[in-house]
Amino acid sequence: MELNDLISKTGQWLKGTGDHGDIVMSSRIRLARNLSKKPFPNKARKKDLQDILAIVQAAVKDILFFKKTILLKMTELDNVDKQFLIERHLMSHEHANNPEGKALVVSEEEVLSLMINEEDHLRLQVMESGLNLNETWKIASAIDDALSGKLDFAYSISWGYLTACPRIPARRCEDPS
């Protein structure tokens, strides 16, 4: 799969086929994770970011959820491609900036996207069409479990998963409002 394959079709979450698709466009769950014993992206050096990218890249290649995905390195994308990915809600504006050591993994149907080295080492996003939070959560949780089987995440018994941004809860869903 290539980026042009995404451009030529509509993402699953945009089709309006889910529950209450006439009212609710999509359901989205996002999880932030960081690797233990690695500096968070805002404190990482270029070499650290490249090492983290290589570690995550090696982990996802063996996980079933990532079999029909494409890995896009931000240094290899032009501004038009980055804007397309932002408009499809597959990555943030911040991820497009300072592209060194950053990548995006996107599934064929755009249900799954994984930003590597944005504000956190991993920003997992799952989007489904319509009002479908339960199924969206099940998918996100299963992917998170698979990733945690391959990667050692930064975790505190007191605080939960450690994130770069205190606004993002470590143990519950984020309220985007």
Regions of interest found by a model, annotated:
Residues M1-S158, C173:
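Long, Pro/Ser/Thr-rich low-complexity/intrinsically disordered regulatory tracts in eukaryotic proteins
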Residues G160-D175:
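Conserved phosphate/anionic-ligand binding catalytic regions in large, soluble enzymes, centered on
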